[in-house]
From Swiss-Prot:
The record marks H227 as: Plays an important role in substrate specificity. One of its GO terms (biological process) is glycine biosynthetic process from serine. Its cofactor is pyridoxal 5'-phosphate. The gene is glyA. The modification N6-(pyridoxal phosphate)lysine is found at K228. (6S)-5,6,7,8-tetrahydrofolate binds at G122, H123, I124. Coiled coil: none annotated. Catalyzes the reversible interconversion of serine and glycine with a modified folate serving as the one-carbon carrier. Also exhibits a pteridine-independent aldolase activity toward beta-hydroxyamino acids, producing glycine and aldehydes, via a retro-aldol mechanism. HAMAP family: SHMT. Its EC number is 2.1.2.-. Homodimer. The keyword Metal-binding does not apply. It is found in: Cytoplasm. This is Serine hydroxymethyltransferase.
Amino acid sequence: MENGYKTYRDKVIEYLEAHEKWRSSTINLIASENVTSPSVNRAVSSGFMHKYAEGWPRQRYYQGCKYVDEVELIGVDLFCKLFGSDFADLRPISGTNANQAVFFGLTQPGDKAIVLHTSHGGHISHMPFGAAGMRGLEVHTWPFDNEEFNIDVDKAAQLIRELEPRIVVFGGSLFPFPHPVKELAPVAKEVGAYVMYDAAHVLGLIAGKQFQNPLREGVDIMTASTHKTFPGPQGGIILYKNFGDDVAKLQWAIFPGVLSNHHLHHMAGKVITAAEMLEFGERYAAQIVKNAKALAEALAEEGFKVIGEDKDYTESHQVIVDVSDLHEAAGGWAAPLLEEAGIILNKNLLPWDPLEKVNTPSGLRIGVQEMTRVGMLEDNMKDIAVFMRRVLIDKEDPKKVEKEVAEYRKEYQKVYYSFDHGLPMKE
C-alpha cells in the first residue's frame, strides 16, 4: 500500500479538525462541558503527558519527577485556598474515579448509602449499577419533593435515622438548586455516617462563591470533576476539611487503590485553572448564574415550560425545560432536532419520569457555563431562546437556523475569564 497506515493518521486528524471547526460554530449548552483557556491547553499538550509519577510529591516511586512535584504542590495550595479545605487531592482522573476512591476507602460491601435517585438527578456513579454498586453498597435514595425540585428534608432526616447508613451523598447531575446540607449533615453525623458531596456540576460556582460551600455546611468529603462549571481539563479532585484519622484510608484508596499514575498533563491544567478561578472565578460564576436565570426567563417568555418558576428557575448553571407537551418523544425528539440547528444540549429524565423513559424523557437539561466563558451575556440568552423556539415550537427548518447560529457564533471565539483574554468587554 502506497501510504500504508498513514491514511488512518490522516483520517483521524481530519476528524479532529472537522470537530473543532464544527464545535466552534455551535451554541454548546451541554451542562457537563466547558472550554479551556490557551494556557490550560498548553499544559495539557506539554511533556507532562509522557511522565509517570505514582505516590506523593517528593515521595515518588519513579525518578525524574522534580518539576511535576513542584506543579502538584502549587496545585494543592491553590485548591485549598480556593475552597477553604484542609487538603486537596488532585490525583483522581475523573469525577467518577474520585467517587470510587471514597466508596472503596470509607465503606465496606453491605454498608448502606443514601443517594439521589437517577430520575431526581443522581449521577450514575452513585447508583447500584455504578461505582456504589460495584463496591457492594446497599443503595437507598433520598425522598424527593417534586414541587421544590429538591430533597425532602423531613422525610430524609427520618430515613437517615431509620437506616443508619455508612455514607450519605449530596449532589448530582440535575442540580438547579443547592441541597439541604446544613439541615441533614448533623442528622447523618448523629448516626455516624460520612457526609459526601459530589460537586462535579457546581465546582466552579462554589469556587466563585455563587453556590453553597459544602465544606462549610458540614460535609466531610467533597468530590468533583474539573471540567464543567470549573473550566479545566477533564479530571477529578477530592477535597476535605476536619476529616480526622480516616484521611489515610481515603488516600490509600486513591493510590494504589483506584489509580496509579494520575495523568500529569491534566493535573497541570487543573492547577492553571485553579489560578484562573482565584483571579476571575467570582465574576465568572456570577455571570453564569445571571445568564442561566436570563435564559430561563427568556425561554418561558418564548412559550417553553421551564421548571422552577416560583423559585426564580435556577441558582446554578442549569436550566431545566419540560418539553413533553411539544412531542410524544419529548426530549428524545427535541435534543437531536436542536443539534441539527447547531444548538447542543441533552435530553434528561425529570423527577416524575419512570426509568423506562430514559430514551424519551420529559426534559432538556441546559447549561450556560461554556457560552458564558466565550463572552456571552444576558442579552445573548434571549437570542438563544428565540433560536430554540423557532426550531421546537415554530417548527422551522433546523438547517436554516443552523446557518444563523454559525454566523452568530463567529463573534464568540475567545476564552474569557482567563489570563489569556481577561474579561469580556462589558465586564
